[in-house]
């Protein structure tokens, strides 16, 4: 069900597994795609669907799922061409977020308001840049990478990896606690050695 229902949303949100410029390198967005499919399968309320995609990472005690949802904001094309001016493309990425968000969530094409007030809809250039300011808080570099996703990157382990990570974290904590205090075995060995001298 979710796969058939979500394809229109994935198109509106400009989902792709590649960066979209001349090299069209691979990027890993399938976890966000799967989040959308699962949201449709669970019949997630639209307000939650919207909030989690636009600002899931800003929710108090955001879950991994809510952070994945914000992949919506990272679906824009990414240019990794040599010689680009990163700040120029960072600006383009933010403008793309504004345009895509307005189209997908509000049903408005407001790209023209980037340069002037909208000719037909009550949307001003000032309002475009107010939305721009909201979306200009993603700490990205503006220049893509040769392989993989542009930073910042959310680490999303599989369930098996999460279990293994938790096991290793507990083991590290135990070993660090052992190292933080004196080692009684060494004290006994040192005392024995001193008596032999």
What is each residue range found by the language model?
Residues 1-159:
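Short, structured secondary-structure elements
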Residues 154-197:
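Long, non-membrane, amphipathic alpha-helices that form coiled-coils
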């Amino acid at each position: 069900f979710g796969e058939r229902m979500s394809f229109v949303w994935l198109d509106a949100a400009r989902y792709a597994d590649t960066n979209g410029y001349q090299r069209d390198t691979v990027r890993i967005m399938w976890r966000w795609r799967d989040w959308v499919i699962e949201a449709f399968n669970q019949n997630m309320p639209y307000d939650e669907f919207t909030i989690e995609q636009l600002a899931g990472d800003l929710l108090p005690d955001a879950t991994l799922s809510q952070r994945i949802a914000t992949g919506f904001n990272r679906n824009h094309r990414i240019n990794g061409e040599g010689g680009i001016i990163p700040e120029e493309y960072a600006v383009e990425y933010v403008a793309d977020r504004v345009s895509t968000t307005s189209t997908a969530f509000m049903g408005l094409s407001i790209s023209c308001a980037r340069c002037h007030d909208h000719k037909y809809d009550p949307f001003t250039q000032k309002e475009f840049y107010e939305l721009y300011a909201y979306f200009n808080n993603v700490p990205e570099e503006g220049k893509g990478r040769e392989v993989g996703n542009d930073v910042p990157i959310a680490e999303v382990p599989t369930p098996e990896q999460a279990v293994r990570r938790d096991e290793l974290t507990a083991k590290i904590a135990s070993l660090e606690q052992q190292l933080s205090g004196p080692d009684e075995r060494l004290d006994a060995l040192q005392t024995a050695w001193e008596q032999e001298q």
